[in-house]
Structures are given as structure tokens and as C-alpha cells.
């Protein structure tokens, strides 16, 4: 027992010594350091951990493979001094701002190059450049809150994917297969030949952010791109807001564009084109649109080799009706406020009219808008078809509307004066002193409606009434005077005898009473 106790004591002492030694061991793998020059910055990146700029630094640095680094720009600027970038990332890098990373004026030099093995998260900071891409991504990158500004109209602000030659791919040869991922959650992005170019093998996802350009599209997609939000606007010489292109379904440039949401404003505040086609390629690829707001023209799609299919969204151009998916249509809720793409079932149930415009059909919420559209676009009035008729009910005596209407689908009969729909509650007018006589087509109450009734236009139905006769007082009868006569003749003989007999009986009774009183007095005396 004693030996066992000594053995346990020795082990406990050894364990305590190991803990003490560990406490004094250096811990530099995740050191939080502040750096003021290129050498110290590179050393900190080699070690990994949290690194903070303490001054403006000129120098191109690299995050090694296998290292995890959080770089806080701390309001300072890191400027490249050699190609291919101010920061080359082969590891896992998170950048926080404020501060700036500048690709400088060197050719083929970006602010940041994310290599195929790199994972980059740009959560802040401003990234600038003037001679090449501002951001070149061949790995996995997420941008949430950063700003990217391109001063060079000859290059895109962001290039996601392979260009196809080593010079534009930072010395890397394009593989036969790769997945290059860029996710943009939020931020501000501007300038360049394109603001964002989704290149070979690129998979682009945009859920938010502001994208502006003056010389080219906001987004050029060559492979796979999905837009679920964001504000996209271009101006001046831009060919369109969104450009798409493809080299075929089996190539690294599939040209598959999906737009579910977002706001898109064409050049010159909406007078230019929404879509454009990437230069080169074998086709314009496919664009599947299920939502979003589009201020711009679609007329140029006739000349583009882009297969566009629309199942949702709002558009200022009625030409969207040419590109709707089967089962969907374009509908104008209010003339001058654009066209919404809805299901044909929804349009048939809610629209008042539709207009055949060439090979397409456009629905309108009211008949007047449909007629105006036909007139403005030189469409024969016979191509305007009213789908529903509104019946308004009016008091035929006062010309005051009852406030109730009925919407009747074209071709359907009205079996009663229904409210809201033909199956709704029946309106039965009542007026004191009058009897309701039925509904009429005219205010003169000469054309009575016979139900079932099929309306052929919007119309008013007038309630007819007949005035009741004055009420008759039953006590007055027929107003003839009735008189009564009082009898004054003498009573008959039989009546007089009865009266005399009654008097005799009364006298006899009185005499008997007097006699009784007299007897009582004698006894008392």
C-alpha cells in the first residue's frame, strides 16, 4: 500500500510539472499582432492568427496554404509592389475593415488574388485597382460588406473563374475541371468593362449589394450565375445591365443564368437594354427569370441569341409578353406602371380585358387601359377583348348608387341581382311607401331585365318602384254617416205592473223592520 501511494504521488507531481511547463510554452500560432511594414506583415501571415495593420504598407504578401488569418486593415492601406496582387491567398483569409487594399498601377496586378486552394471572406475594406482585375478568384470567396472600385474600363472589377491563359490566371494553367465559387451577400461594386465577370468554371451567387457601371454590364455570365437580390444599374455606353454568353453545355462556359429577384435599371435611366450578349461564344446561353424589377427595353432580344424564359417579375416594357413561360402572361395592373408576369389563371380571374399584340397577349386590369394600349400601339380595336363586366346597381328614383356591384365573367349569365359575384347574395331594394318592381336597363324604367341575363358590357341596372296607395282607417268604413235614435215612449203595461209590485214589496219589508225594533225596545224597557 505504501509503494502504491508513493507511485501515485510521483505521477501527480510529474503531471503538475507538465502543466507548469505548458503555461510557459510560446504560443505564436494564433498570435494577435500589429504590424507596420511588409516584413513583419509577411511573418505574421506565415504564423497565422489575427493580424492588424498599424500603418500604411507597400508590399505584396502571401497567406500560405494551411494557414488561417484574420487581417484587420484598421483604417490603413496595403498597396501592391509586384504582380499578381497585393494579397495572394492560398489558405483561409478573412479581411475586415475599414481600410484599403490597392492593386496599384502595376499591370496584371489585383488587390487580392484568391488561389485555387484559397478560401477568402471579405467582410469589410475597400478594394481598388486601375490596371487589371481588382479581385481575381480561382478558389472560394464570399463578399459581405466590402467595397470594390475599378478605375480601368479595360478590365472587369471582379473576375471569378479562369480566363483561359496563364497570364490572366496568375500563372495557373486552366484545368479540365474546376469549381470556382463566388458568393456576394452585400457590398458596393462599381466600374470596369464588367463589374462582375463570371468566367470559366465560375459559379456565382448574388443575394444583395449595389452594382453600378458606366462602360459595361453590371454582370457578365459565362458559366453558372444565380441572382436572388441586389440593385443593378448601368449608364452611358453599356450594352445592357446583364450580359450572358456560352460556348456550349459541355464547356466550362455553359451560360446558365437564373434571376429570382433584384432591381435592374438599363442605360440612360431605363431607355437602354436590360439584356446583352457576351462577345464571342457560340450562343447567348439561357436566362430563366422568375422575379425582379426591370426598368428598360427588351426589344433587342430579337437580335440576341439568348434564350429567355420569364415566369415572374415586373417590367416597364410590354415586350416581355413575347418571352413568358407557357402558362404565364403579362398583365398591366395600371397603365403606365409596367407589366407583371403572372399565371394565366390569375390573369383570367382578375383582368378586365386582354389585347392580342402580334403573337402575344397582354392582360389589363380595366378596359380603358386596354383600349389606350391598343390605340398607342396602333392595334385594331377588334383585338381588344373584354373579359369581365361590372354591373352597378342604382336607385331608379334617386339615381344614387347602392354601393354594391357585381363582376360577371364574359359569357356568363346573371340569374339574380347578385353582389360581388354571380353567386353572391342577392340585392333586394326596399323603400318605405313603395313596392320594388324589378331591375331595368334604363333610368326611365322602360326596359325591364328578365333573369337569367347575360351582360355584354359594363352597365348600370336601375331599381324600379311603384308607390303604394294611402292606408284606409277601418272605423271610417266608406265615410258614410251613421245616426242613432233614443226611445222616449211610455213603458208597456206589463212593465208598470212589475214596477208597482216591487214598490209594495219594499214597503212591506220596511214595515217588518220597524216592528222588530219596537219589540226590542219593549224588552229592554
Where are these regions (language model features)?
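C-terminal low-complexity, Ser/Thr- and acidic/Pro-rich disordered "stalk" regions positioned immediately N-terminal
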Residues: 460-495
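Acidic Gly/Asp/Thr-rich repetitive segments characteristic of extracellular carbohydrate-active
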Residues: 32-56, 347-383
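Surface-exposed loop/turn motifs in large extracellular/passenger domains
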Residues: 63-70, 88-103, 113-132, 136-153, ...
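Extracellular interaction modules
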Residues: 282-284, 304-308, 331-340, 374-380, ...
Amino acid at each position: 500500500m505504501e509503494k502504491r501511494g508513493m507511485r501515485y504521488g510521483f505521477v501527480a507531481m510529474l503531471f503538475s510539472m507538465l502543466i507548469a511547463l505548458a503555461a510557459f510554452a510560446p504560443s505564436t500560432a494564433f498570435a494577435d499582432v500589429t504590424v507596420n511594414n511588409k516584413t513583419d506583415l509577411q511573418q505574421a501571415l506565415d504564423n497565422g492568427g489575427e493580424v492588424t495593420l498599424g500603418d500604411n504598407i507597400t508590399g505584396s504578401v502571401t497567406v500560405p496554404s494551411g494557414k488561417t488569418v484574420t487581417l484587420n486593415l484598421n483604417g490603413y492601406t496595403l498597396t501592391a509592389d509586384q504582380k499578381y496582387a497585393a494579397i495572394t491567398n492560398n489558405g483561409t483569409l478573412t479581411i475586415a475593415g475599414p481600410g484599403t487594399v490597392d492593386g496599384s498601377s502595376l499591370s496584371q496586378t489585383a488587390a487580392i488574388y484568391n488561389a485555387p486552394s484559397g478560401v477568402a471572406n471579405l467582410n469589410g475594406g475597400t478594394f481598388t485597382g486601375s490596371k487589371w482585375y481588382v479581385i481575381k478568384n480561382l478558389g472560394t470567396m464570399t463578399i459581405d460588406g466590402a467595397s470594390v472600385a475599378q478605375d480601368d474600363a479595360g478590365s472587369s472589377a471582379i473576375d471569378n473563374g479562369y480566363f483561359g491563359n496563364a497570364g490572366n490566371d496568375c500563372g495557373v494553367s486552366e484545368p479540365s475541371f474546376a469549381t470556382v465559387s463566388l458568393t456576394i451577400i452585400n457590398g458596393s461594386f462599381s466600374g470596369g468593362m464588367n463589374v462582375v465577370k463570371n468566367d470559366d468554371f465560375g459559379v456565382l451567387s448574388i443575394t444583395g449589394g449595389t452594382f453600378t457601371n458606366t462602360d459595361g454590364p453590371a454582370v457578365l455570365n459565362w458559366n453558372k450565375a444565380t441572382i436572388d437580390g441586389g440593385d443593378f444599374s448601368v449608364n452611358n455606353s453599356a450594352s445592357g445591365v446583364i450580359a450572358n454568353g456560352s460556348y456550349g453545355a459541355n464547356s466550362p462556359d455553359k451560360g446558365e443564368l437564373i434571376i429570382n429577384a433584384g432591381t435592374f435599371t438599363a442605360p440612360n435611366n431605363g431607355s437602354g437594354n436590360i439584356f446583352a450578349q457576351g462577345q464571342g461564344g457560340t450562343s447567348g446561353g439561357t436566362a430563366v427569370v422568375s422575379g425582379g424589377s426591370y426598368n428598360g427595353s427588351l426589344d433587342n432580344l430579337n437580335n440576341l441569341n439568348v434564350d429567355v424564359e420569364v415566369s415572374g417579375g415586373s417590367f416597364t416594357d410590354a415586350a416581355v409578353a413575347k418571352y413568358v413561360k407557357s402558362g404565364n402572361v403579362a398583365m398591366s395592373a395600371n397603365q403606365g406602371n409596367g407589366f407583371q408576369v403572372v399565371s394565366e389563371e390569375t390573369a383570367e380571374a382578375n383582368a378586365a380585358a386582354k389585347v392580342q399584340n402580334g403573337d402575344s397577349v397582354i392582360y389589363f386590369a380595366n378596359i380603358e387601359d386596354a383600349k389606350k394600349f391598343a390605340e398607342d400601339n396602333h392595334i385594331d380595336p377588334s383585338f381588344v377583348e373584354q373579359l369581365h363586366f361590372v354591373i352597378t346597381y342604382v336607385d331608379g328614383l334617386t339615381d344614387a348608387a347602392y354601393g354594391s356591384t357585381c363582376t360577371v365573367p364574359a359569357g356568363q349569365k346573371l340569374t339574380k341581382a347578385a353582389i360581388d359575384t354571380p353567386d353572391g347574395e342577392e340585392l333586394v331594394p326596399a323603400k318605405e311607401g313603395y313596392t320594388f318592381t324589378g331591375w331595368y336597363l334604363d333610368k326611365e324604367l322602360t326596359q325591364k331585365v328578365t333573369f337569367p341575363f347575360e351582360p355584354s358590357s359594363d352597365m348600370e341596372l336601375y331599381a324600379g318602384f311603384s308607390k303604394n296607395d294611402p292606408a284606409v282607417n277601418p272605423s271610417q268604413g266608406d265615410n258614410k254617416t251613421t245616426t242613432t235614435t233614443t226611445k222616449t215612449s211610455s213603458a208597456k203595461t206589463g212593465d208598470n205592473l212589475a214596477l208597482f209590485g216591487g214598490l209594495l214589496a219594499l214597503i212591506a219589508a220596511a214595515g217588518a223592520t220597524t216592528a222588530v225594533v219596537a219589540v226590542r225596545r219593549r224588552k229592554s224597557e
